[in-house]
From Swiss-Prot:
Quaternary structure note: Interacts with RUNX2. Binds consensus element OSE2. Interacts with TRIM28.
Domain KRAB: 12-83
Protein family per UniProt: Belongs to the krueppel C2H2-type zinc-finger protein family.
Species for this entry: Homo sapiens
Free-text note on domains in this protein's UniProt record: KRAB domain is essential for transcriptional repressor activity and ability to inhibit endothelial angiogenic sprouting. Not required for nuclear targeting or for DNA binding. Zinc finger region is involved in nuclear targeting and DNA-binding.
Protein name: Zinc finger protein 354C
Length: 554
């Protein structure tokens, strides 16, 4: 198809790049299609403004910027035209156009069209023949494929611009006079082929205009945007402005799209469904993230360590490990965190909130992971096994800490006294010896402790609570460590081995006492007789026996 545009003297107007729908068709569009329409129209308008073309803001753009539905009037081409399709026009009159001569040579016929005094003068016999060709091709493949399959070129020669799209698109939808502006666009008349008008969104996206560059720059951070609307939305990050308010819960948002997504929480609407597992979501972005669970795709990679992530937000949080950045600070204790979720979990320490309850015993937890680990006590599930001694654990962190007994690893070292620990909790408690910090006080006896767990253990002395029970003999203990040591009686496990003679013990305290045999260290003496003893318990037993305590007589 060869096209010659003669006498193209008129500048581009917004009407040239606008698309209009009838009220009836607008109501049949879903939210995603309406959002696409708004995006394309606002971007086309912004692009024309960036070209420096002087014109006032159209009513349609004002409505779209305010988040309103565009007002449209449907008009039909008179029935005697026999074109068989509808045309949607703006309520204002059509602009005047110069003559347009169109040559159709693929089948040896010539078509001429002219626009005089603001009216379209069309050779209708050829138009009907051309429409039938379109319908035949539509039956073979969808409109999107039709557009993709045709070669599209834009060539410029002086003041004349030609656009070649092939025969699948009606000529008037592709060609409008312009003055030396190399941009793609849709004219003031937008045709729908048949009743499947939703496919026209593909056509609309195809003709979206991009004059090049990002002319709209943020004065705060220097970021640039193609559309002024996007710049305005971005600036709300700096100003904190949130103009969109939810009528249900009064929560506010900086973007209208965020408000629409949020409102689906109240309505329960989940229009986006995963074809793999049938799981549904309230917004498309969440569905896209979810699909990566099935595909295993991790498109976001850390430049520092090469670790990959399925979500950009997860990468952002991860990168703060390298930078040391901690944006989220606790208002109670000034402790800072690198992500908001960790701050929320931490704040439950101050509020005492425990939203996760065990259905078996009613015990509450501040974290879901803690509840999941606790529930394994009821089910008896032991997921993690030590390869050295075969011992099983309900938590992987407990297994890692346990394995340090075998390896002797002590990664946590005190900067004050250089003492090392194999558990962070033990290291954290030790540090408070140097600082003298004791935040947690027992209300019964006034004794203070450096950490909350020590206070809880201490309070069991007053309450007599023994929550840890042996599955073998039923004996109960106030501390989990006591239960662990007791279970070694049944298993015969002896973790603590003397490096001098190879003798093994079930308890660390027994190993420590044994080591004094090799060092000949005798710390405990009876003042009356001066007899030395290796451990205090031996001294106590000897004193009772010497004084005639019947409990220790053989």
């Amino acid at each position: 198809m060869a096209v010659d545009l003669l006498s193209a003297q008129e500048p581009v107007t917004f009407r040239d790049v606008a698309v209009f729908f009838s009220q009836d068709e607008w109501l049949h569009l879903d939210s995603a299609q309406r959002a696409l329409y708004r995006e394309v129209m606002l971007e086309n308008y912004s692009s024309l403004v960036s070209l420096g073309i002087p014109f006032s803001m159209p009513k349609l753009i004002h409505q779209l910027q305010q988040g309103e539905d565009p007002c449209m009037v449907e008009r039909e081409v008179p029935s005697d035209t026999r074109l068989g399709f509808k045309t949607w026009l703006e309520t204002e009159a059509l602009p005047h156009r110069q003559d347009i001569f169109i040559e159709e040579t693929s089948q040896g016929m010539v078509k001429k069209e002219s626009i005089k005094d603001g009216h379209w003068d069309i050779n209708f016999e050829e138009a009907v023949e051309f429409e039938s060709e379109i319908e035949e091709e539509q039956e073979k493949k969808p409109l999107r494929q039709m557009i993709d399959s045709h070669e599209k070129t834009i060539s410029e020669d002086g003041n004349h611009t030609s656009l070649e799209l092939g025969k699948s698109l009606f000529t008037n939808t592709a060609l409008v006079t312009q003055q030396s502006v190399p941009i793609e666009r849709i004219p003031n008349m937008y045709y729908t082929f048949g009743k499947d008008f939703k496919q026209n969104f593909d056509l609309m996206k195809c003709f979206q205009i991009y004059p090049g560059g990002k002319p709209h720059i943020c004065n705060e951070c220097g970021k640039s945007f193609k559309q002024n609307l996007h710049l305005i939305e971005h600036q709300r990050i700096h100003t904190g402005e949130k103009p969109y308010k939810c009528n249900e819960c009064e929560k506010t948002f900086s973007h209208r799209s965020s408000l629409l997504s949020h409102q689906r929480i109240h309505t329960g609407e989940k229009p986006y469904k995963c074809n793999e597992c049938e799981k549904a979501f309230s917004n498309s972005s969440t569905l896209i993230k979810h699909l990566r669970v099935h595909t295993g795709e991790k498109p976001y990679r850390c430049r520092e360590c090469g670790k990959a992530f399925s979500q950009c937000s997860t990468l952002t949080v991860h990168q703060r490990i390298h930078t040391g950045e901690k944006l989220y600070k606790c208002g109670e204790c000034e402790k800072a965190f690198n992500c908001r979720a960790k701050l929320h979990r931490h704040q439950r320490i101050h509020t005492g909130e425990k939203p996760y309850k065990c259905s078996e015993c009613g015990k509450g937890y501040s974290q879901f992971t803690s509840l999941a680990e606790h529930q394994r006590f009821h089910t008896g599930e032991q997921l993690y096994t030590c390869l050295e001694c075969g011992r099983t654990f309900t938590r992987i962190v407990t297994l890692i800490e346990h394995q340090r007994i075998h390896t002797g690893q002590k990664p946590y070292q005190c900067n004050e006294c250089e003492k090392a620990f194999n558990q962070y909790s033990s290291f954290n408690e030790h540090r408070k010896i140097h600082t003298g910090e004791k935040l947690y006080t027992c209300e019964e006896c006034g004794k203070a402790f450096g950490c909350k767990s020590n206070l809880y253990r201490h309070q069991r002395i007053h309450t007599g609570e023994k929550p840890y029970q042996c599955n073998q003999c039923g004996k109960a203990f106030s501390q989990y460590s006591f239960l662990t040591e007791h279970e070694r009686i049944h298993t015969g496990e002896k973790l603590y081995k003397c490096m001098e003679c190879g003798k093994a013990y079930s308890y660390r305290s027994n190993l420590c006492r044994h080591k004094k045999v090799h060092t000949k260290e005798k710390l405990y003496k009876w003042k009356e007789y001066g007899k030395p003893f290796i451990c205090s318990s031996s001294l106590t037993q000897y004193q009772r026996f010497f004084k005639g305590d019947k409990a220790y007589e053989v």
